[in-house]
Amino acid sequence: MASFKIAIIGAGSIGFTKKLFTDILSVPELRDVEFALTDLSEHNLAMIKSILDRIVEANELPTRVTATTDRRKALEGARYIISCVRVGGLEAYADDIRIPLKYGVDQCVGDTICAGGILYGQRNIPVILDFCKDIREVAEPGAKFLNYANPMAMNTWAAIEYGKVDTVGLCHGVQHGAEQIAEILGARDGELDYICSGINHQTWFVDVRLNGRKVGKDELVAAFEAHPVFSKQEKLRIDVLKRFGVYSTESNGHLSEYLPWYRKRPDEISRWIDMSDWIHGETGGYLRYSTETRNWFETEYPRFLEEAGRPLETIRRSNEHASRILEALETGRVYRGHFNVKNNGVITNLPADAIIESPGFVDRFGINMVAGITLPEACAATCISSVNVQRMSVHAAITGDIDLLKLAVLHDPLVGAICTPEEVWQMVDEMVVAQAKWLPQYAHAIDAAKERLARATVATREWKGAARREVRSIEEIRAEKEAAKLRAAG
C-alpha cells in the first residue's frame, strides 16, 4: 500500500492524540504513513512528538512523525485531516461556565449547546473555516476532514455547508452507551446489536437486540434500575428512558443540560445527578476534569514517556471511529459505525440541513449512511429544538450577527427555561466582551456591548452552582490514585 499523510490539528491534546496514533498503528497496513502534528503550543507539540517518536522507535516502525506550528505546512498533501481543537483553551472555557452561572444557568459540560456550547461554537467556526480553506488549497485532492472537536454538530455543519470540504463528525457517545446496555443485559461480545439515531449528544437507541431478540423499554428500565452503579449514576437518563421509551446515548451530565426540565431549579439538581464522577452532572465538571488532566500530564510526563516504550501489541485499540474509518477506506474491510453527516433524508423526521448522527458503513467507496430511519416523536421533537439552536448559532458565527446569536441562546432549551430575554441579552453581551479576542467576527459589536453592560440593569450573582467541586491539587490526585490502586488490589 502506498504511503500517505495524516494531519492532526490540535495535536497538543496529548492523551487523545496518543490514542488516535496507537489506534491507527494497530492496523498493519497503516504503519508506513506520515503523521503531521500541528498545534499553537510548541511546548505541547514537543511533548506529544517525543511520546510518539518513542512508540515508533520501540516498535521499529516505518512511521514518520513531524510537528510544526505552521498548520498549512502540516496539511500539505494530507489525505486525512483530524481536528481535536479547543479554541480559547481552558481560559475561554472557564468563561463558558462562569458567566452563565451568574444568570442561574448551571452547566455540567457546556460544549454542545446551552450558553457555553453556543459561545464555544462562535470561537470554533471561524477557525474551522480557516482549516477548510487550507484543506481545499494544499491537502491531497479529495482529502477527508474528520472532526472530533465540539460543538460537534455546529463545527461539522460549518465545515460542510460553508467550508465545502468532505467532512464527517466523530464521537464516542454511542459506544459508551452500548457498553452500558451490554453490561446490564449480561451480553457477551457479538451478542448485542443496536441502531442509534438522532443528533450528536442526543442520539437514541431506537432498536436494541440481544441475540436477535428485540429488547423493549420495560426490560431496559428494570435492568438499569437493578444495576448497583448505573441506578445511581444515570438517574436522569433512566427517567428519560421511562418517559421517551428509548435510552439516550449521552452521559447523565451531558443530557441534563440539553433538556429544559432537570437543571432549571437549583434545589432539584441534586435529585438527578450523581457526584461519584464529574460526568454524572457536577457543575462545571468537565472544566474541572480538563484542568486536572492538564496539570496531571505536565507533572507525570516523564512516566508517560517511559510507558510509550511498550510493545504496540500490548496497547488495546480503543473504540474511537477514526482508525476504523481509515482502515475501511484504505483496505476495503467494511466498518459499521455511527457518524455525523448532513441529514439529507437519512432521518425522515429531522430537517434536511441538520447534522445528524446515525449508522453508516465504510468501505473503499466511502461512508454510506443507512437511510430512512424515523425517530420516535418525542426524540425528534427534542432533537429539532436543538437543531434550530444550532442552525441559528452557525449562521450567527458566519455573519457576526450578535442579535441572531442572542436569539440562538434565547431559544436554547435550558437557558430558555431559566432566563428572561433581558437576562439572555445581557449574558451574551458579557460573554462576547469577555471572549472578544477569540471572536473576530464580532469585533464590530464589542464597543456597543461594553456600553450596554456599563448601564446594565439586570441583577446577577456570583454563584458557584448547585454541585461544584474545587480543582484538586496534583498531590490530592496522586493520593486518590494510589488509594484506588490499593482498593483494586484488595
UniProtKB/Swiss-Prot annotation:
Residue intervals passing through the bilayer: none
Active site: H172 (proton donor), Y258 (proton acceptor)
GO biological process, one term: carbohydrate metabolic process
Chain residues that bind Mn(2+): C171, H201
Co-factor remark: Binds 1 Mn(2+) ion per subunit.
EC number assigned by the record: 3.2.1.22
Sites where the protein binds NAD(+): 4-70
Coiled coil: none
Matches recorded under SUPFAM superfamilies: LDH C-terminal domain-like, NAD(P)-binding Rossmann-fold domains
Necessary cofactors: Mn(2+); NAD(+)
GO molecular function: alpha-galactosidase activity; metal ion binding; oxidoreductase activity, acting on the CH-OH group of donors, NAD or NADP as acceptor
Record InterPro entries: GH4_Enzyme_sf, GlycHydrolase_4_CS, Glyco_hydro_4, Glyco_hydro_4_C, Lactate_DH/Glyco_Ohase_4_C, NAD(P)-bd_dom_sf
Reactions catalysed according to its record: Hydrolysis of terminal, non-reducing alpha-D-galactose residues in alpha-D-galactosides, including galactose oligosaccharides, galactomannans and galactolipids
Keyword tags: Carbohydrate metabolism, Glycosidase, Hydrolase, Manganese, Metal-binding, NAD, Plasmid
Binding residue positions for substrate: N150
Record CDD domains: GH4_alpha_glucosidase_galactosidase
Assembly notes: Homodimer.
PANTHER family named among the record's database cross-references: 6-PHOSPHO-BETA-GLUCOSIDASE-RELATED, ALPHA-GALACTOSIDASE
Family: Belongs to the glycosyl hydrolase 4 family.
Protein name as annotated: Alpha-galactosidase
Organism (species): Rhizobium meliloti (strain 1021) (Ensifer meliloti)
